[in-house]
Amino acid sequence: MVLEGQYLERSVAVKSGEIALDGLYHRGRKAPPCVLAPPHPVLGGSMTVPVIAELAWAITRAGHPTLRFDYRGVGASQGTIRHQPGTERIGDIAGEVDDLRGAIDQLLASTRSQVVCAIGYSFGAAVVLAAAADASIDRIVLIAPPVIGWDFSALRKVEKPVFVVCAGNDRHCDCETLRGMLGKGAVMAVIPEADAGFLRSLPHLGRSVVAWLRTGPDLPDLDDHSDEPRPDEGGFREIELHDSGEPVPELDLDD
């Protein structure tokens, strides 16, 4: 029995073609349901990394159903990893994109929804972007997309709400480079003190994504230190988040 307010994910098998992937699902009542794509499978990327775990917790606490999963060949998921061990190159992601689509199908069936929000972290951001045109995805969130070494220029063509989070000290996600890839209507949040792992900024990361989910494509009501949108940046809007050092408040699930 799950008590009211208790955070308890359920282990699920996610079908991806002929193989089964390991996943963790938590039910919720608010739209949209959210699927979370983890980082690079040969660099320790799994659904249990702190960023994915924090996002699943924060989004679930806000009332949204979540599904996080492991790619083929990772953890208890069937299949094999096709990437070269030890490489930081993204390479062919067709298999991982299929895995994401399988997870989306599972989440749609579980929630009886028509669309999901697809959230990708690092390598997972490339996977989400590759599937962004799918009708089953109505908005995307990209956390620390590795724009150094991978082509994210397709971001300009995404005609759906987009939220991007950039860490100020991430050598794979240069904020200036990322700004040049954003299209009209995108929202970009910068956490200057964070690195690629967001270990000291996990609460801020979770809160920013939850706030954006609540407002959709509108600017989240956060610690906004840029009073006006940048007028020369292609129509996207940017906010800057700073660690206030204060405890993170409980989220109100009734609004």
Positions of predicted regions on the chain:
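Acidic catalytic loop of the alpha/beta-hydrolase fold
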Residues: 168-173, 196-197
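Long, low-complexity, intrinsically disordered segments
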Residues: 234-255
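Short beta-strand/loop motif that positions the catalytic acidic residue
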Residues: 158-159, 163-166, 170
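Serine-hydrolase catalytic machinery in alpha/beta-hydrolase-like enzymes
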Residues: 14-113
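Primarily recognizes the serine-hydrolase "nucleophile elbow" in alpha/beta-hydrolase
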Residues: 98-160
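Post-His helix in hydrolase/transferase enzymes
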Residues: 199-213
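An N-terminal hydrophobic leader/cap segment in hydrolases
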Residues: 1-15, 21-27, 118, 221-236, ...
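Short glycine-rich catalytic loops that host catalytic nucleophiles or stabilize transition states
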Residues: 189-195
